[in-house]
Amino acid sequence: MDSLMNTTPGGGGKPVRMSSREIAELTGKRHPDVKRDIEKMLSDLSEDASIFAHIYLDSMNREQSEYLLDRDHTENLLMGYSPILRRAVLARMREMEALLAEPRV
C-alpha cells in the first residue's frame, strides 16, 4: 500500500495526498466506482477534476488514471461513505501525515 500514497517523508513541504486507488483498497470499493464518486463530488463543487488527475503505469505498463486528493477533498468524499469506511481511510491519512512529520535523517 505504501506505493499508493503520495507523501514526502521528512516534512518535504508537500501536503499529504491520498490516491483514489488507495481509497478503493481501504474501502473495498472498485477503483472505477471511487473515481466516479470523486468526479461527481468535484462536479458538485464546481471544481476542475483535471487538477486532481494523475497518470500511473499499471502492472502491465499501461497508462491508467487516478485522482490524488488532499485531506479536505478526501474527507468530503468520505461523507458519502459508511462510518466504518471513513474510519479506515482517515486512520491511513493520519499515518501518512505522521510519516510526513518525521524528521528526515
Residue positions per predicted region:
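An anion-engaging/catalytic patch
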Residues: M1-V105
